[in-house]
């Protein structure tokens, strides 16, 4: 069984090679001439300036410094019908973009039905990425 688990973990790591090595703050990206991050596979991911400005308009100055991009949308092997977003500011942004602010509570983790993934990626194509998470 251990060999199978190692193979699965290797494949998941390969599938997730599009994830950033490190995320940058929205503030830092807005100050860059070419807003980009380096991915695990060595390539670069570029952010659309208008998308960065959209996010900045949703947040106060302190939150602009705290928001790390791209926002990672987690897809778990256990809860395949759900997606998860982590981080207080990240959760706030996703809720605002989806119009889920009614009765807004500050949360550090947001679980949503998986069908929201397409809507989030359509509205924020360069500032979000999805990651496959292995859970046993």
Curated annotation (Swiss-Prot):
InterPro entries membership: UPF0216
HAMAP family recorded: UPF0216
Family of the protein in this entry: Belongs to the UPF0216 family.
Protein name per Swiss-Prot or TrEMBL: UPF0216 protein PH0358
Species, as recorded: Pyrococcus horikoshii (strain ATCC 700860 / DSM 12428 / JCM 9974 / NBRC 100139 / OT-3)
Native organism taxonomy: Archaea, Methanobacteriati, Methanobacteriota, Thermococci, Thermococcales
């Amino acid at each position: 069984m251990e060999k199978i688990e190692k193979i699965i973990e290797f494949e998941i790591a390969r599938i997730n090679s599009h994830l950033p090595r490190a995320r940058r703050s929205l503030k830092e990206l807005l100050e860059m001439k070419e807003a980009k991050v380096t991915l695990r596979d060595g390539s670069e991911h570029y952010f659309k300036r208008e998308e960065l400005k959209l996010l900045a308009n949703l947040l106060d100055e302190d939150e602009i410094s705290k928001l790390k991009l791209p926002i990672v949308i987690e897809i778990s092997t256990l809860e395949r019908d759900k997606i998860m977003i982590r981080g207080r500011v990240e959760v706030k942004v996703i809720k605002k973009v989806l119009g889920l602010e009614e009765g807004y509570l500050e949360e550090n983790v947001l679980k949503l039905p998986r069908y929201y993934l397409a809507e989030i990626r359509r509205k924020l194509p360069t500032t979000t990425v999805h990651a496959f998470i292995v859970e046993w």
